[in-house]
Amino acid sequence: MTNITALLLKHQQKFPHGIWLILSLFILGFASNGQPVQAKTPGQTQPVSAAVKESQMSLRQRLRQSRTANGVSQSIPTGVTLPSNTPTELRNLLTQMDRAASQGDIKGVMQLYGPNFTHGDGLNAQSLEKSLLALWKRYPQLRYSTQLQSWKAEGNVIVAETVTNITGLPSANSNNLALNATITSRQRIQGGKIVNQTILSERSLITSGNKPPQININLPQQVRVGQEYTFDAIVQEPLGDDFLLGTAIEEPVEVSKYLNPTSVDLELLTSGGLFKVGRAPSTPGNRWVSAVILRGGGMTMVTQRLQVVR
């Protein structure tokens, strides 16, 4: 079996210095600490992940924190889109959240969450704060934009669905990685504070290099327990003489995975992308499904949430 490390060293000119730095140190992405799961080609039905253990890299600090809020830099204005009939309580909360997060004011953000805050992924107020601080430290320049999709009153509770877009430009702190994420979530608000949050959908894109691969992802948003599904990450541009390395990762959504690193293995891809077949677990829950693809011009990592229902 070809040794990928030796192969890369032999053709080092195809991988710029920045890419080598990323491979040598870590990739900041929506990734986490989990045991490798099996990856198979179409026709096989095991969970998605790396197939060949040849070249390791760490994916650190899953930016899943961004789904729960609100990391932005004070130098970039935020944008909140609110319907005209938005209740004052909800309007004030979203406006204050934007202002505090824009300033990197963790106390200002956390005071908008109830002390007994709960989250569909198992977060509480303490773990949320820790996640936000890690996110802001690594990505100090994020553009944050929230749209209120809908709201309704349930007694003294407001239930609001929002779409959050987060865009981060490359910086030294982020190892020159660019971030673009979209998170749809449902919040329960009581007494002007968020008491519960559930992620409905999420998708993130992280890129590095002067010409990262352009990737189309095919993955269902929801599958039933035990159902077979396909996961394709297709590179759009011609490869030319470039090597293409990549892997797929599939892991459960858990609190422990928000901050801890994951080691994954890259495989040499013989086709223009990743083409995997997986089977949903036998119990309901949420999964993170990611594709990492590396070529001479840069790196792209795409992560999407997969809901497993009965």
Regions picked out by a protein language model, each given a short descriptive name:
Residues 40, 45, 177-213:
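Short beta-strand edge/turn micro-motifs at domain boundaries
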Residues 133-177, 181:
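Surface-exposed, charged secondary-structure patches
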Residues 233, 277-297:
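Short, aromatic- and glycine-rich surface loops/edge beta-strands on solvent-exposed regions
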Residues 299-309:
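Edge beta-strands of extracellular beta-sandwich domains
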Residues 101-120, 126:
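Short, well-ordered alpha-helical segments enriched in acidic and aromatic residues
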Residues 36-99, 103:
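Short, low-complexity N-terminal intrinsically disordered segments enriched in polar/charged residues
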Residues 195-249:
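Low-complexity, intrinsically disordered terminal/linker segments enriched in charged
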Residues 267-276:
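Aromatic sugar-binding surface patches on proteins
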